[in-house]
Design a protein with these regions (language model features):
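Signature of the SF2 helicase/ATPase Hel1-core->accessory helical subdomain module
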Residues: 1-24, 229-235, 243-246
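Phosphate- and divalent-cation-binding pockets in alpha/beta enzyme and binding domains
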Residues: 4-7, 63, 157-161, 213-216, ...
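Inter-lobe coupling linker of SF2 helicases/translocases
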Residues: 7-110, 141-144, 256, 265, ...
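Amphipathic alpha-helical interaction motifs in eukaryotic regulatory proteins
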Residues: 9-12, 31, 135, 162, ...
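Conserved Helicase C-terminal RecA-like lobe
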Residues: 44-60, 84-216, 287-327
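Conserved RecA-like P-loop NTPase helicase motor core
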Residues: 171-268
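A conserved SF2-helicase RecA2
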Residues: 231-240, 244-326
Length: 327
């Protein structure tokens, strides 16, 4: 799944080197030469998307404001006309903020904050509101007899959640888990098999960069929770397909929850991903590629910040530099 029509230009140019193709013409040029069967045509049940927004604690919000100010300072040099879209630098700044929102303890790895007393006090409070919610929700679903797939872009989150849910038989997969024989439960294949066959294994925690392709979980799991997401639309759509694919029974009700902190970078990521999915749906003439949100009250990471596009950068800069500069 490309992130934008621009990603299809090189593919089209390779197939038709004599054709003049640009970002704006590639969609019209590709329409007559591709065939794609949509999920709607296959009769796959519609996926239900829900957003759950949780508030930061007062202390986390205070540190978040400090972090935003620091990011604004770091981004100032890239706002000049000559270097406005130094995407990698912007991506690194954004990833630090996303890490903190998903799990405040990740900020303790940053030497600028390692000895901040506020960070220490925050870590004594909890694992953070998002992880607290995800673990609580996973327990609710497990109590209903459901298996749950939990996604996070950060390896430390993947392992931490699996540890917190070890009483539910939680397994985890990220880039550090080796491939191997499915009879060995320490391998990627072994963990997947256990999730499929062991009734005591109620939870699988995974990283989209390492586990978004080549795995079918829809036969045993129709519920996924995203602790966080990156700007990488390809990883997101592929990870979603682990539980939403051909073979689902017609009466299945697959559901996805996106967990966000209120008034945070999470909303910027969601808006950008929704736009990318909508753009690709129009390009591929596939209305099933949609993320209709209903609100609910209440070095793999390097690959993610390298996936930041110029439009993502614009959205990030607008978020950090618009509105109240004291926020």
């Amino acid at each position: 799944m490309p992130q934008s029509p621009k990603d299809m230009v090189s593919q089209f140019s390779f197939l038709y080197p004599t054709k003049d193709v640009t970002d704006t013409t590639v969609i019209d040029l590709i329409q007559p030469i591709f065939v794609r069967t949509t999920k709607g045509q296959l009769g796959i049940p519609k996926l239900d998307h829900r957003v759950v927004q949780v508030p930061m604690t007062q202390l986390q919000r205070e540190i978040y404001k400090t972090l935003k100010s620091e990011v604004r300072r770091q981004l100032n040099p890239v706002l000049s006309d000559s270097s406005r879209y130094e995407l990698r630098r912007i991506g690194k700044c954004v990833m630090k903020v996303m890490e903190f929102v998903s799990n405040p303890s990740l900020l303790s790895n940053d030497m600028d904050y390692a000895f901040d007393r506020r960070v220490g006090a925050l870590l004594l409070e909890s694992d953070g509101p998002k992880i607290d919610y995800v673990c609580r929700r996973a327990r609710q679903l497990a109590a209903e007899g459901k298996k749950v797939l939990i996604w996070s872009s950060f390896v430390q989150n993947v392992e931490l959640i699996a540890l917190r849910l070890s009483d539910l038989g939680a397994e985890f997969i990220h880039g550090g888990v080796d491939a191997g024989d499915e009879s060995d439960f320490d391998t990627r294949e072994g963990k997947i098999k256990r999730f499929h066959t062991d009734d005591t294994c109620k939870v699988l925690v995974a990283n989209p960069a390492a586990c978004s392709e080549g795995i079918s979980l829809h036969k045993v799991c129709q519920y996924a929770i995203y602790l966080d997401r990156s700007f990488n639309a390809a990883h997101y759509m592929q990870s979603e397909d682990r539980i939403h694919r051909l073979g689902l029974s017609p009466d299945a009700k697959p559901q996805i929850e996106f967990v966000e902190c209120e008034d945070s970078i999470d909303q910027v990521v969601r808006t950008r991903l929704e736009l990318k999915v909508k753009t690709m749906a129009q390009a591929l003439e596939d209305s099933s590629l949609s993320v209709e949100i209903s609100s609910v009250d209440y070095d793999e990471e390097a690959e993610d910040y390298d996936s930041l596009t110029a439009d993502d950068a614009k959205a990030v800069i607008e978020y950090f530099f618009s509105g109240d500069q004291n926020d």
